[in-house]
């Protein structure tokens, strides 16, 4: 059993790796559950203070043995939106106070809002927001840059 507290991350991709590195850097205990053995080995090398567990993060027994009900936050960062949402809801049911699923499909954001989850990570929306902020800065100095980008992206920025 993993000690209580800390953050649990489901999935060991780039976002999870970067988040774990940032959390470990400020002294937060991090545990990552990842299916892929090669990814687990890489994570263990790059994140020596993190606890890396190989297994299926949708397995309730595994999550219980990893102490999900005792963690401060649960972040679901797999490549599957449906899996992220279901496991985030499971973590919420276990009593985790802060639960955040990653949603790649923006169409799912309306569904997430119906679940009672506090937060969601939507990489496409984050990138669009960053681009929009950058273009607003250009538009104020160059005039029409914002209109051009808005047209190119089909109005997806705002």
Question: Predicted regions: what is each one?
Answer:
Residues 1-45, 49-50, 61-73, 98, ...:
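Cytosolic regulatory domains of K+ homeostasis systems
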Residues 16-19, 81-87:
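Short glycine/serine/threonine-rich phosphate/pyrophosphate-binding segments
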Residues 53:
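Conserved Rossmann-like nucleotide-binding pocket used by diverse enzymes
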Residues 56:
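Conserved acidic residues
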Residues 59, 80-81, 105:
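Short loop-to-helix capping motifs
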Residues 71-83:
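Rossmann-like NAD(P)-binding element
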Residues 77-78, 103, 124:
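Glycine-rich, N-terminal phosphate-binding loop of Rossmann-like dinucleotide-binding domains
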Residues 90-94:
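Alpha-helix C-terminal capping segments
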């Amino acid at each position: 059993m993993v000690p209580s507290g800390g953050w649990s991350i489901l999935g060991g991709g780039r976002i999870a790796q970067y988040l774990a590195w940032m959390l470990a850097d400020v002294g937060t205990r991090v545990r990552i559950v990842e299916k892929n053995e090669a990814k687990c080995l890489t994570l263990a090398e790059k994140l020596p203070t993190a606890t890396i567990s190989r297994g299926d993060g949708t397995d309730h027994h595994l999550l219980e043995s990893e102490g999900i009900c005792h963690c401060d936050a649960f972040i679901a960062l797999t490549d599957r939106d449906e899996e992220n949402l279901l496991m985030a809801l499971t973590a919420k049911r276990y009593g985790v106070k802060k639960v955040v699923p990653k949603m790649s499909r923006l169409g799912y954001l309306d569904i997430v809002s119906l679940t009672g989850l506090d937060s969601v990570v939507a990489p496409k929306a984050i990138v669009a927001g960053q681009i929009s902020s950058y273009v607003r800065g250009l538009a104020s100095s160059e005039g029409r840059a914002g209109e051009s980008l808005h047209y190119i992206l089909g109005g997806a920025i705002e």
